[in-house]
């Protein structure tokens, strides 16, 4: 939950001692986003600017600073680090909704730390627990369980230095009154480097609707199947990889 800086190349014009600017042919992040027609049935594009996305993320990160996180070494860091670098001149965002399901894609020339993503969603960090300590929801307990998903097939495969991380998350929230909500979401992150794009980060998140607070809990509904999300993220990656053709 995001225009490419141009590199000016000077070429000496033979015989006249002058230089001419050769335009950078790299595509801008906005050119590498999914098209509305690529989205799953029922999703409708909604307005969202890079500035609005970054501001919304910043509020969530500030709130998270006062929460207890266990294991503490699993506290996510990649989102906050990248968020501080997002600007309208280096990023583009696509947002869409289907009823209460939200989808956000970000393409940016800024580098995301995928190693931190992998660490925070696997191994001993595949299950984490967050406890809210301040405000009206103090005492709320949030358990997040991550499941790794396969990297979608790409023509020619990922090149040296490129990588991708995909996860499915199941979030179980126990409120102070003991009511329990569940929510299923997906996230995909990739670093790609192609001649037509330069190095870019592609990230796609889909958040399903949270269930009503009940006890015993009501299972959350997945916004997409695992295979459906992998396929959609594959389309997002192909927007970059196919641009070289």
Locations of regions flagged by a protein language model:
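N-terminal export and membrane-targeting signals
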Residues: 1-8
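C-terminal motif of bacterial Sec signal peptides marking the signal peptidase cleavage site
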Residues: 12-15
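Bacterial signal peptide processing site
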Residues: 17-19
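Post-signal peptide N-terminal segment of mature Sec-exported envelope proteins
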Residues: 24-44
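Sec/Tat-exported extracytoplasmic proteins
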Residues: 37, 43, 47, 122, ...
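A small/polar (G/S/T-enriched), proline-flanked helix-loop surface module common
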Residues: 50-180
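Extracellularly exposed regions in secreted/surface proteins, prominently low-complexity, repeat-rich
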Residues: 135-245
